[in-house]
Design a protein with these regions (language model features):
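Domain-level signal for soluble alpha/beta catalytic cores
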Residues: 1-245
Length: 245
C-alpha cells in the first residue's frame, strides 16, 4: 500500500450455498476476479463453517500459487459458530489442509471473550489471527454503537501478542483510535515473544466428552419430554429466572 508497506487483502465474506451455485464456486469466482485485479493476499472471513472454502482455495492456488490466504471464523463466546461448529475443530481442519497460510477468529466476540477462545486452540501450526469486535453492540438513540474502549481493546490484544498470536486487528466497532492504541501497546512489548499460544490441557477433549444430560437421557429411553421457553429476565437480577427454570 504505497510507501507504508502495508499488505492489502482481498476480503471475502461467507458465501451462500444454494442448489444452483455451490459455495465453492462462489468463493472461487470472486477470488479469481480479485486475482485478475492484482490481488495476491486473500482473507476469507466471518465464516461459520469451512464448507466450500478449502476447495476454492485449493483451486485458486493452482492459478495463483503465490497467493497468501488467511481463513477466519466467527465464533461465539461459548466456542461454537452459528452453525454449531466447534472452533478448535475448524481451526485444526483448516490448518491441516495444506492450502491455507494463516487461520484465526474474527467478529461476534469481544476482545476478552476471544482471548479465552484462543486458549482453546493451542498451536495450529500456522500463524494465528485474531480480529475481535470492539465490544458488544448496544442501541442508543436508534443507532448501534460498540461500547468497548480503545484502552480495553489494546490491553486484551497485546496480551494475545504476548501469548503468541501473530496477526492482530479489529472487526465491528473498531476505529482508528482502537488500532492506534493497539499499536502503542504492541510497541511496549519485549521483542522476544512465544511462537504460538499454549492450549489448555482439557480443550482438545471438549468435543468428545459425553455429558450426563437428563434431557438427552430421556430422549434415548423413549420418555416423554416437555420443552418450555422462559421469558428473558427484565433486569440483571437472575434469581426469579433461575427459580422458574
Amino acid at each position: 500500500a504505497g510507501e507504508t508497506g502495508a499488505a492489502v487483502f482481498a476480503d471475502l465474506g461467507p458465501a451462500p450455498d444454494t442448489e444452483n451455485l455451490p459455495a465453492e464456486q462462489v468463493y472461487l469466482a470472486v477470488a479469481k476476479r480479485f486475482a485478475l485485479l492484482g490481488a495476491r493476499n486473500f482473507l476469507f472471513e466471518t465464516l461459520s463453517a469451512e464448507d466450500g472454502v478449502l476447495e476454492a482455495i485449493r483451486a485458486l492456488k493452482q492459478t495463483v500459487p503465490e497467493a497468501f490466504v488467511l481463513v477466519s471464523f466467527a465464533v461465539l463466546p461459548d466456542g461454537y459458530t452459528r452453525e454449531g461448529r466447534y472452533c478448535a475443530e475448524l481451526v485444526r481442519r483448516v490448518a491441516q489442509s495444506g492450502v491455507v497460510d494463516a487461520v484465526g477468529l474474527n467478529c461476534v466476540s469481544a476482545p476478552g471473550a476471544m482471548r479465552a477462545l484462543v486458549q482453546q486452540l493451542g498451536d495450529a501450526g500456522l500463524p494465528l489471527s485474531v480480529m475481535p469486535n470492539a465490544g458488544y453492540p448496544v442501541v442508543a438513540r436508534a443507532q448501534v454503537r460498540y461500547q468497548g474502549k480503545p484502552e480495553y481493546f489494546a490491553r486484551e490484544l497485546s496480551r494475545l501478542a504476548a501469548e503468541g498470536v501473530r496477526i492482530l486487528g479489529g472487526c465491528c466497532g473498531t476505529t482508528p483510535q482502537h488500532i492506534a492504541a493497539l499499536r502503542t501497546a504492541l510497541d511496549a512489548l519485549p521483542e522476544a515473544l512465544p511462537a504460538a499460544p499454549a492450549a489448555k490441557p482439557a480443550a482438545a477433549a471438549k468435543s468428545a466428552v459425553e455429558t450426563d444430560d437428563a434431557f438427552l437421557r430421556k430422549l434415548r429411553t423413549g420418555q416423554r419430554v416437555i420443552a418450555v421457553e422462559l421469558d428473558s429476565p427484565k433486569d440483571a437480577d437472575m434469581t426469579a429466572y433461575l427459580e422458574g427454570a
